[in-house]
Amino acid sequence: MSAPHNVLTKKNPRRGRFAFPRRRVRAGSIDEVVQLLRLPANIANGIHTRHKKCWNDFRGGGGGGGGSRVDGTRAFVDLYGLGYLCNRTNSTLADYLCTLFVAEAYRDACCAQPPAPFPDYNASPPDCRPPLPPQPPCKPNDSELLDRIVRQNDLILNGLNQLCLNHSNHHFELSNILNSIKLQNVNIINQLSQIFDDGVLSGLDEKLSRLIADLDGHFADFGSALDAALAQLQDSLRNDLTNINSILANLTSSLTNINSTINNLLQTLQNLGLGEVGAKLNDVQSTVDRILGVLTPEIVAAAAAAAAKRAH
């Protein structure tokens, strides 16, 4: 496969900023790469400016003549910029462009030639000019080096393909999630529209106001009934407590009267002299016993035996 001829590249023979030896930095046209890969025109805005050059930059470095017909504002990118652009699509053409770019850079490094000097318009006559030094011959291509480069490029391309695949998978997952969210939003909007169309929410304020008014009326009635029940309960408790106090007062007075009666009875018994009456009764009983012993001794003996048994 040959390189596409419409991919314009330019060599920059300037020395690197890190004091590397003189080398040629290859750059590719942004417009033609974007056109080949069918990318949007503004995708190059994501490339840092240090990886982009214009035609005037190459001319300032001695890479082009004053009679070039190429547009001076035309932009170019280095290997990093080309990799950035090729990573935005998943195609064999992007892989081929990266491989061709690296291969040409290695080939130029192997076959490096000093840049052609600018013509000296104030030079001396031809007889007085010193002879030009001979140009070194181009080194032959080293197949082993190229094979190694090919393997490295394959590894790089495999990594880029894997990154592109992962990016595509993540993009697909995010797209599915966004689509599901959009579908849910559409369903919710449709349901809300259906609710508003059916007029379900039209009389909701009135219904809620009526319900609140009914609840307020029920709560007021319940409060009144509860207050009446509590007042009635208080009256009943008050009456019951009054009756209990009356009963306790009556009991207290009755106990006081009973106590007074008992005291009076005790006083009366003390005044009667029961001790003398008992002594007189004992005398009468002893007299009767003597009479009975004289008249009926058997009865007296039986009574004495019964008394002895009771004593045992």
From Swiss-Prot:
Key word Zinc present: no
Main location: virion
Top-level taxonomic group: Viruses
GO terms, molecular function: structural molecule activity
Function (record text): Major component of the polyhedra envelope.
Record-linked InterPro entries: Baculo_PEP_C
Protein name: Polyhedral envelope protein
Residue stretches in coiled coil: none
Pfam families according to UniProt: Baculo_PEP_C
GO cellular component: membrane; viral capsid; viral envelope; viral occlusion body; virion membrane
Entry keyword annotation includes Transcription regulation: no
Record's subcellular location: Virion membrane
Alphabetized UniProt keyword annotations: Membrane, Viral envelope protein, Viral occlusion body, Virion
